[in-house]
């Protein structure tokens, strides 16, 4: 019925994570990092995920205090810029989404760090000059309510969503700019913009937040959503909600770059933390949190999850013209 299989419900038990001698890579930094005694991590991951990662690092390196600050992409960017203007950066490591990682790199706010773990990450999932590496990627899917959508009406392509049966029955995120740009990049500009305009004519329901959209689909407020992630629906399905999802080609893919602050207060601790996040054990933790790790020797769960999927990433050229695409999105979907 769909391209991917569902991931099983996750259970992360911190005390059962056994760390192997991967840390030999980090020996160069450990003494200096422990002397610094602290690392500050800015992230857009949800609080429970951030805590699982930082608690695991703290267990491995008890002499280093780990502090994390979780917020949205735009709020985090503003905080980083405010600190930079004041000449008092407080953060060491950042984990954000693709566009904001691009902005941080472009504005000179990231330091190059060629972690020894980066060799396990493919081109396209890391900056060629070492400024960031993506720790995991989230993939967009079409999620729907199984009580409201008959099997015959389950979409097999984006074009299927332009049929009369879907008019007024699709939810999209009110500021889904990366979904918009990645889908256009994947389809090709002319075809992509044509699809977006046709989708807007279907009178989609605009809401704030991918998790909320999935919840509204489960509640039957509308039949499906095009801008949520796989894990949004897996979580609901595990709780018994009448939902399912399919991957439509191209599937929006959002990298999650990890990078070191250009003026890190604790640079050695920051490097050690990045090594940990990119290590196989760190990536196994990412996988246990129902995310799809980007490290090549750490397959998703199940390993066949991405078979047949055509990912679409926003191109650097589009990022360079991102403001214009935001205006296009607002114009096409009537967002003020």
Segments (PLM) and residue ranges:
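Extracytoplasmic ligand-binding site segments that recognize negatively charged/polar headgroups
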Residues: 27, 40-54, 66-84, 89-221
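Periplasmic-binding protein-like
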Residues: 123, 137-138, 166-175, 196-200, 205-207, 277-299, ...
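A bilobed periplasmic-binding-protein/Venus flytrap-type ligand-binding module shared by bacterial periplasmic
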Residues: 141-148, 184-186, 254-266, 285-286
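Extracellular/periplasmic bilobal clamshell ligand-binding domains
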Residues: 300-336
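A ligand-binding cleft/hinge motif common to bilobed small-molecule-binding domains
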Residues: 98-103, 223-242
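Short amphipathic alpha-helical coupling segments at ligand-binding clamshell hinges
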Residues: 53, 191, 195-198, 256, ...
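Bacterial N-terminal signal peptides
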Residues: 8-21
